[in-house]
Amino acid sequence: MNSTSLYAAIDLGSNSFHMLVVREAAESIQTLTRIKRKVRLAAGLNNDNHLSAEAMERGWQCLRLFAERLQDIPQPQIRVVATATLRLAVNAGEFIAKAQTILGCPVQVISGEEEARLIYQGVAHTTGGADQRLVVDIGGASTELVTGTGAQTTSLFSLSMGCVTWLERYFSDRNLAQENFDDAEKAARDVLRPVADELRFHGWKVCVGASGTVQALQEIMMAQGMDERITLAKLQQLKQRAIQCGRLEELEIEGLTLERALVFPSGLAILIAIFTELNIQSMTLAGGALREGLVYGMLHLAVDQDIRSRTLRNIQRRFIVDTDQANRVAKLADNFLKQVENAWHIEPISRELLLSACQLHEIGLSVDFKQAPYHAAYLVRHLDLPGYTPAQKKLLATLLLNQTNPVDLSSLHQQNAVPPRVAEQLCRLLRLAILFAGRRRDDLVPEITLRALNENLTLTLPGDWLAHHPLGKELIDQESQWQSYVHWPLDVR
């Protein structure tokens, strides 16, 4: 592989050190290596902001691992940044001098505002959804809050609170008592209050989280079969569960890994304070953050207006998808959706996911015609899809699995991006669109009227269409039968 196409970003965080190595490909990035080590640098800061020798040694030890991988990458294509703990440490110079010797490249201590800007860029390049967003990143010793529209930030704040420093300050006795949480939340709200008005003034349509705490919450919710949206009610529920556990070493929540457990209560307290103070309705996990911001900054790639569209284009190119057919199916599915929207009330994000499934429905053919829906589902489940959340990927894979043949109803109920009933409705529309676009010509798609009454679908075709299309009639009869097996009434006239 040509080393000039390789880029590396290293983030010396207060809780963990991370390294990301990527290859530039098709105006996007392909991840080659991700290494993360819990160094807990912030835990080595004393009251005078002096970093202990033990904490520094943990950091250097980690960098020796990273250094081996960096040898293959040209130095101008490497960026190493240090964040909150090394901004605070009075003896940061000693740590950085040795770090630069180990890595063989410069280490830059970035300001809180620059960190916030880079986090926002990482989110803007990798996360789909509405343009106007609030980004929250809870680090080990600082928390970044950024509002912006598209690629432009409108306000940037880096606050002196993090999951490691709050752990040392409010959970140092390792007790998970109501008082510990109350103190941690109150302190976090006090830190937030001076910046809350400006953040609210700029406003947001979506809120995304880009930190280990949010990642941990996502893993917990997926493991427990909840939908992926983080809400204050879910956070309070998890807090009560933590309080029931009593002590940090006894913290057990389904889906919470041992690695994340130590700083989870402190991160949770900060997040509850953010939700409460800013009146956040819901939050989802960002597709990328600081490291992705560093990489995209080196590549000078413009932020795509629609990240999901770029992702779909790249995948269609890679798997030689017939885009005319994909568009034909999408147009038909959209037409069907408009006809039933008064009865089914399908939300815009669900519509977008249906159209994404239409664009990708034939990728399985690049493996083999036989079992193409299984291949399509497998590919979507395992491909990197910038702009789509893990739950959305799972829904897409499930729709593609059920695009034809008998329906696996349980798989539609196991995804958690949309309610099961909505997943069933999207699946029905996708199947009908694929069926009626089957001859791959616009002029051969009949005029179809679709009506919905609760879960009953009535499909009306031109008067003599069925008589003149015996194969089409056979396929429609088969589809009616398959839908009836899962109690989806389909009446064809």
Curated annotation (Swiss-Prot):
Pathway: Purine metabolism; ppGpp biosynthesis; ppGpp from GTP: step 2/2
One MF annotation (Gene Ontology) recorded for this entry: guanosine-5'-triphosphate,3'-diphosphate diphosphatase activity
Pfam family, one: Ppx-GppA_III
One of the protein's GO biological processes: guanosine pentaphosphate catabolic process
Alphabetized UniProt keyword annotations: Hydrolase
Top-level taxonomic group: Bacteria
Enzyme Commission number(s) from the entry: 3.6.1.40
Gene3D superfamilies attached to this UniProt entry: 3.30.420.40, Exopolyphosphatase. Domain 2, Hypothetical protein af1432
PANTHER family, A to Z: EXOPOLYPHOSPHATASE, RETROGRADE REGULATION PROTEIN 2
Protein purpose: Catalyzes the conversion of pppGpp to ppGpp. Guanosine pentaphosphate (pppGpp) is a cytoplasmic signaling molecule which together with ppGpp controls the 'stringent response', an adaptive process that allows bacteria to respond to amino acid starvation, resulting in the coordinated regulation of numerous cellular activities.
Name of the protein: Guanosine-5'-triphosphate,3'-diphosphate pyrophosphatase
